[in-house]
Amino acid sequence: MRFAIVVTGPAYGTQQASSAFQFAQALIVEGHELSSVFFYREGVYNANQLTSPASDEFDLVRGWQQLNAQHGVALNICVAAALRRGVVDETEAGRLGLASSNLQPGFTLSGLGALAEASLTCDRVVQF
C-alpha cells in the first residue's frame, strides 16, 4: 500500500511528530511504500536545522533527514507556514534579505499542491 503522512506538530513539545516518525518507520519495515511526508503548520519546525536537542534525546530533525536519504521519502515543507515561522532555504533567505537560511538538507519548501498530489496518488494519507 502507498502512504503519505501529514505532520502538523513540532519536532519537540508534542507527540505528533515523533508518532509520525515511528509510524513512517513501521510502514517501511512492513513493506509499504511511503511516498512523502508533508509538514504543515507547526510541523515545519521539523525542518529547522538549528534545532539542538539534549544529548539524551532523539534528534528527530536528523531522523527525518535519514528517512529521506535511506528510503527516498520526499520531505515537503509548506512554504507559507515555513516563512511565517522563520524556516527558510537559501533562495528565500536571499529573496527576503535575511542573513542566513536554516532549512535542513533533505527537506523541500513546497506549496499545498504537493499535499494535493499525495492525496491523489496515495492509497492512504495519515495526519499527525
UniProtKB/Swiss-Prot annotation:
Domain of life where this protein originates: Bacteria
GO terms of biological process kind: tRNA wobble position uridine thiolation
Cell location: Cytoplasm
Entry-linked SUPFAM superfamilies: DsrEFH-like
Active site: C78 (cysteine persulfide intermediate)
One GO cellular component term noted in the UniProt record for this chain: sulfurtransferase complex
Entry keyword annotation includes Transferase: yes
InterPro entries to which the protein is assigned, alphabetical: DsrEFH-like, Sulphur_relay_DsrE/F-like, Sulphur_relay_TusD/DsrE
GO MF term set: sulfur carrier activity; sulfurtransferase activity
Documented EC number(s): 2.8.1.-
Gene3D superfamilies: DsrEFH-like
Record's keyword terms, sorted: Cytoplasm, Transferase, tRNA processing
The protein's role, per its UniProt record: Part of a sulfur-relay system required for 2-thiolation of 5-methylaminomethyl-2-thiouridine (mnm(5)s(2)U) at tRNA wobble positions. Accepts sulfur from TusA and transfers it in turn to TusE.
Annotated family: Belongs to the DsrE/TusD family.
Record text on subunit structure and interactions: Heterohexamer, formed by a dimer of trimers. The hexameric TusBCD complex contains 2 copies each of TusB, TusC and TusD. The TusBCD complex interacts with TusE.
UniProt name for this protein: Sulfurtransferase TusD
Phylogenetic placement of the source organism: Bacteria, Pseudomonadati, Pseudomonadota, Gammaproteobacteria, Enterobacterales
Gene behind the chain: tusD
